[in-house]
Regions:
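N-terminal beta-strand-loop-alpha-helix module at the start
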Residues: 1-71
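Glycine/tryptophan-enriched, flexible segments
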Residues: 158-298, 448-451, 456-493
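Short His-Asn-centered micro-motif
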Residues: 6-10, 29-30, 69-71, 97-100, ...
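Hydrophobic/aromatic-rich, well-ordered segments within soluble, folded domains that form packed cores
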Residues: 47-67, 96-97, 357-380
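Long, charge-rich alpha-helical interaction segments
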Residues: 442-444
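Active-site-proximal binding-pocket segments
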Residues: 262, 267, 272-440
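Active-site cores of enzymes that catalyze phosphoryl transfer or operate on phosphate-rich substrates
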Residues: 4-10, 210, 221-244, 295-333
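Beta-rich, aromatic/charged-enriched effector core domains that present basic-aromatic interfaces
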Residues: 78-222, 403
Length: 493
């Protein structure tokens, strides 16, 4: 039986893990449709093409047979037309492919194989540590799922940071220790400079011709090969790991990276596996006496949140994308793309996303999605914006993060409450100064709570907000509600 191995642009796993006979051809394709069904950030498209071509080169250097369609070869032809041509030409009867994480593409791929009577073999994905089956077993028949419970299970399963099956340091999470504001004058380490892929100029031309109306500036600043991401990780360990935990939630008006590893896009492309990242981080921490709150916080992001989000998506993604718990209907305007809303922290976060396709998780959760949610933006609009604006976006990433964590649009499948805040939290965690924007954000916050009073008053954890709302000075309340309404009218449709 003639076999074809298909490798997608987010399955660029280290060559050592490919486990394939060199007689079996490998199919890869750059595809205009996959770049444009959502207007992906220009730097994201550049990263994908750079990483895919670099991976193609590595495969060929290791004597694998690669069938590669680049942007100069039938670029406008659909992905499945290209695949069909190779299947038919080579009389392929079976396709091997790693598990496809994004459900819409997985559905299309299964339909292609069924229509063309091709056997398909899904291989376990090195992109994750836990299996889909194991996560489903964790879910059981419960209706609500706590990330903290899953994280404990993963720590025990992997025997990480344990002593006599109990957490080192006496607790599972040091999150409460990781909420420090950056001290005045703190010197933030610079990210390493990455050498662009050798064909980056050609890739840039493709993007400028075909995707000129997509958001974002066009840069090559992220690793596009295994060798580069290993070096990137080592520099993170050396320069930023030690104080990563302390300032994990800090916001800086001029800086979008602070001490974060910025590994998400590389992990989501498959350039490095989470298992390797965990192993290297544990080894480095032991040798260099990294504080436990930094090590634990870093590990929790990978084996806690990342694995958990993937599992939630696989089991609840279809339900989430049809959910709109708050019945929000407002639409975004151009101000949310060019950073001209008038709320300074929001505009700086937007401009960071425009420039880099990246900003860290607190900007994403407590500024971007928070303010969008407070403005009653339709969660489908928010999902689309996050998919467009971030270099690490994928359906499996953004569906749970937007519909679940960011907006509570799913009604609480795994989030214990809506993550919303007024200006006081932003001021406490950042170096932004008080200004007119504070009245707008505070108005949006209290207006949201008043409009959803029935929800908040029935939740023991949240009913305090209603009591605080009732104590607002009437003149203050009138002023900030006017500010909020004017803002919503200005920046939504």
């Amino acid at each position: 039986m003639k076999i074809l191995r298909v490798i997608l642009g987010n399955q660029l796993f280290p060559i050592s893990q490919i486990n394939l006979s060199k007689d079996v051809p490998i199919f890869m394709a750059e595809d205009s449709g996959l770049c444009s069904y959502i207007k992906h950030h220009k730097s994201k498209i550049a990263l994908f093409f750079s990483a895919m071509r670099s991976y193609r080169d590595q495969l060929k250097n290791n004597s694998y047979k690669v069938i590669y369609y680049d942007a100069n070869n039938n670029f406008s032809t659909s992905y499945f037309e290209k695949l069909f041509h190779e299947v038919k030409s080579n009389k392929i009867k079976k396709i091997e492919i790693y598990e496809i994480e994004d459900k819409p593409f997985e559905k299309d791929f299964l339909e292609f194989c069924k229509t063309n009577n091709i056997e398909i073999n899904f291989l376990p994905s090195p992109m994750f540590i836990d299996s889909r089956g194991a996560f489903k077993y964790f879910l059981g028949d419960k209706k609500f799922h706590l990330q903290a419970n899953y994280y404990k299970q993963m720590r025990k399963k992997m025997n990480l940071l344990l002593e006599d099956n109990k957490p080192i340091g006496g607790k599972w999470s040091f999150d409460e220790d990781n909420r420090k504001k950056l001290p005045s004058g703190y010197k933030i380490p610079k990210l390493p400079t990455i050498k662009p892929y050798k064909e980056f100029s050609e890739i840039s031309n493709v993007i400028n011709i075909n995707f000129s109306n997509h958001p974002g500036e066009l840069h090559s600043w992220m690793p596009h090969s295994y060798e580069q991401i290993v070096e990137w990780l080592e520099i993170f360990f050396k320069d930023r790991f030690r104080e990563f935990g302390h300032y994990e939630d800090a916001i800086d008006k001029n800086e979008h990276f602070i001490n974060h590893s910025v590994l998400s896009s590389s992990l989501n492309l498959g350039l490095i596996t989470p298992k390797e990242v965990i192993d290297k981080s544990i080894a480095y921490a032991k040798k260099n006496d990294i504080p436990l709150n930094s090590l634990e916080g870093f590990i929790r992001q990978i084996i806690g949140w990342r694995e958990f989000i993937r599992g939630i998506y696989q089991n609840y993604g279809d339900q989430m994308v049809t959910s709109n718990y708050w019945n929000h209907k407002n639409k975004l305007t151009a101000a949310w793309y060019d950073g001209s809303t008038g709320i300074e922290p929001l505009d700086e976060a937007i401009k960071g996303a425009q420039k880099y396709g990246y900003t860290h998780h607190i900007n994403r959760l407590m500024i971007l999605s928070n303010i969008m949610n407070l403005c009653n933006i339709d969660p489908n609009e928010i999902y689309k914006w996050f998919m467009e604006m971030f270099i690490d976006s994928s359906d499996w990433v953004m569906v749970p993060n937007v519909y679940g964590m960011g907006t509570f649009a799913d009604g609480g499948i795994f989030a214990t409450k809506p993550y919303i805040c007024g200006s006081s939290y932003i001021l406490r965690m950042s170096n932004f100064k008080k200004g007119d924007w504070c009245d707008i954000v505070d108005g949006l916050y209290w207006k949201f709570i008043e409009e959803k009073k029935d929800f908040f008053i029935t939740n023991p954890r949240l009913s305090l907000m209603i009591r605080a709302l009732e104590k607002l000075n009437p003149d203050r309340k009138k002023h900030i509600f006017e500010c909020a309404n004017n803002f919503i009218n200005k920046v939504t449709q």
